[in-house]
């Protein structure tokens, strides 16, 4: 007889219902064609998951290194259940590609951990424009799915503050 882990522990299943979630998107404008395609695919997927257009806020920034500043400011507002970073870094002839790729990824992760807010990283790092073109549709949709799933997970794992307040009032 084979037992699954759900026979022994409580399992929080992936929840891709975006209804009532408030999602912020930060899109870089550098390599704009790729970024606009990423954003379009992402928003279309968010809508298909039940996030309403009025619950999606999009801001644009000059490039990938500026994404983290906007994410930080959006996280500080407390208005969002999840954030999405979208951009495209294409390798050139200098070390700049590695710097931008590494720093943008590290800062996005740091903001997510420090703020406790899920952030889907959709900053493409590709060698060529062709590679970026091949990835924009899938990556944009994957970021939407990831942020909805992680926002729902965060909400499910967050204690209900009202219950705690009511319980302490009854004492």
From Swiss-Prot:
Sample GO molecular function, one term: 6,7-dimethyl-8-ribityllumazine synthase activity
Superkingdom of source: Bacteria
This protein's pathway: Cofactor biosynthesis; riboflavin biosynthesis; riboflavin from 2-hydroxy-3-oxobutyl phosphate and 5-amino-6-(D-ribitylamino)uracil: step 1/2
Database matches in Pfam families: DMRL_synthase
Residues noted as binding 5-amino-6-(D-ribitylamino)uracil in the record, renumbered to the chain: 30, 64-66, 88-90, 121
Reactions listed under catalytic activity: (2S)-2-hydroxy-3-oxobutyl phosphate + 5-amino-6-(D-ribitylamino)uracil = 6,7-dimethyl-8-(1-D-ribityl)lumazine + phosphate + 2 H2O + H(+)
Residues binding (2S)-2-hydroxy-3-oxobutyl phosphate: 93-94, 135
Any one GO CC term of the record: cytosol
EC identifiers of the protein: 2.5.1.78
Signal peptide (UniProt feature, chain positions): none
A single BP term in Gene Ontology: riboflavin biosynthetic process
The entry's keywords: Riboflavin biosynthesis, Transferase
PANTHER family per record: 6,7-DIMETHYL-8-RIBITYLLUMAZINE SYNTHASE, 6,7-DIMETHYL-8-RIBITYLLUMAZINE SYNTHASE DMRL SYNTHASE LUMAZINE SYNTHASE
Task performed by this protein: Catalyzes the formation of 6,7-dimethyl-8-ribityllumazine by condensation of 5-amino-6-(D-ribitylamino)uracil with 3,4-dihydroxy-2-butanone 4-phosphate. This is the penultimate step in the biosynthesis of riboflavin.
Stated name of the protein: 6,7-dimethyl-8-ribityllumazine synthase
Gene giving rise to this polypeptide: ribH
